[in-house]
Amino acid sequence: MSLNFLDFEQPIAELEAKIDSLTAVSRQDEKLDINIDEEVHRLREKSVELTRKIFADLGAWQVAQLARHPQRPYTLDYVRLAFDEFDELAGDRAYADDKAIVGGIARLEGRPVMIIGHQKGRETKEKIRRNFGMPAPEGYRKALRLMEMAERFNMPIITFIDTPGAYPGVGAEERGQSEAIARNLREMSRLNVPVICTVIGEGGSGGALAIGVGDKVNMLQYSTYSVISPEGCASILWKSANKAPLAAEAMGIIAPRLKELKLIDSIIPEPLGGAHRNPEAMAASLKAQLLEDLADLDVLSTDDLKNRRYQRLMSYGYA
């Protein structure tokens, strides 16, 4: 896979370009009387070392860029890599099927679970079809329908959060966007089955919270979770989106800060360079965390599960 490098990764990109050039030359003329392999090996080691150095000291704005990386794995990528027998379910049974939310039944190590997550899309047509991962009310109503189905069949619910936010269009507001989000928040707090939520990319405002009320809330290492985007915050406070890096630092949008505030439970480490560098390894780490969380929640009674979830929600906002 050809990698897209972000601005802060340009030194790495330059090294990788040299490696690609040398590799191409080696393929074109195998009779060259020079040892290219040794030079390629040296450059690869240098690239890994440089990547470690850069990623050891990322700021919040750089993490925000990684969370939005166009090659970052999405919900359906993790479904393919970490689950078996996925059967997608569609529609809210009232208005439409919102493609920005995907959901269905799958097996996690043989155990039936309900999966619900945002899906952004990669190519232009798919991005438009999925509305860039910004759900309308029917998307959240579909999610709630699947959660209620999971409760009826006593299946754990696993959600994957990756959205810039709920769709703010006029049509969405006319169809009750705020009501749909509020209803999900209420009903998720009452569910009688375990709910595990994981932020895999962007966790944008109420659009993220509408599938983010759970017994366990995890974040991938280079994901973000915030009430507004850094650009939106900067536009309000400084009247300029150019102040987004400053806003990102001030807002505390990254996983370590949110864990410090006890808003999330676990940070799932990503492969060196981010989840897009090795989706298979990332999926394996995510799967291990989900299995661990399920084991922790399985021992709780229904009453204990709901009481614990309630206490968790009521503790937000206290230092």
UniProtKB/Swiss-Prot annotation:
<dbReference type="GO" id="GO:0009317">
    <property type="term" value="C:acetyl-CoA carboxylase complex"/>
</dbReference>
<dbReference type="GO" id="GO:0005524">
    <property type="term" value="F:ATP binding"/>
</dbReference>
<dbReference type="GO" id="GO:0016743">
    <property type="term" value="F:carboxyl- or carbamoyltransferase activity"/>
</dbReference>
<comment type="function">
    <text>Component of the acetyl coenzyme A carboxylase (ACC) complex. First, biotin carboxylase catalyzes the carboxylation of biotin on its carrier protein (BCCP) and then the CO(2) group is transferred by the carboxyltransferase to acetyl-CoA to form malonyl-CoA.</text>
</comment>
<dbReference type="InterPro" id="IPR029045">
    <property type="entry name" value="ClpP/crotonase-like_dom_sf"/>
</dbReference>
<keyword id="KW-0276">Fatty acid metabolism</keyword>
<dbReference type="GO" id="GO:0003989">
    <property type="term" value="F:acetyl-CoA carboxylase activity"/>
</dbReference>
<keyword id="KW-0067">ATP-binding</keyword>
<feature type="domain" description="CoA carboxyltransferase C-terminal">
    <location>
        <begin position="35"/>
        <end position="296"/>
    </location>
</feature>
<keyword id="KW-0275">Fatty acid biosynthesis</keyword>
<protein>
    <recommendedName>
        <fullName>Acetyl-coenzyme A carboxylase carboxyl transferase subunit alpha</fullName>
        <ecNumber>2.1.3.15</ecNumber>
    </recommendedName>
</protein>
<keyword id="KW-0444">Lipid biosynthesis</keyword>
<keyword id="KW-0547">Nucleotide-binding</keyword>
<dbReference type="Pfam" id="PF03255">
    <property type="entry name" value="ACCA"/>
</dbReference>
<comment type="subunit">
    <text>Acetyl-CoA carboxylase is a heterohexamer composed of biotin carboxyl carrier protein (AccB), biotin carboxylase (AccC) and two subunits each of ACCase subunit alpha (AccA) and ACCase subunit beta (AccD).</text>
</comment>
<comment type="similarity">
    <text>Belongs to the AccA family.</text>
</comment>
<keyword id="KW-0963">Cytoplasm</keyword>
<keyword id="KW-0808">Transferase</keyword>
<comment type="pathway">
    <text>Lipid metabolism; malonyl-CoA biosynthesis; malonyl-CoA from acetyl-CoA: step 1/1.</text>
</comment>
<dbReference type="GO" id="GO:0006633">
    <property type="term" value="P:fatty acid biosynthetic process"/>
</dbReference>
<dbReference type="InterPro" id="IPR001095">
    <property type="entry name" value="Acetyl_CoA_COase_a_su"/>
</dbReference>
<dbReference type="InterPro" id="IPR011763">
    <property type="entry name" value="COA_CT_C"/>
</dbReference>
<keyword id="KW-0443">Lipid metabolism</keyword>
<dbReference type="GO" id="GO:2001295">
    <property type="term" value="P:malonyl-CoA biosynthetic process"/>
</dbReference>
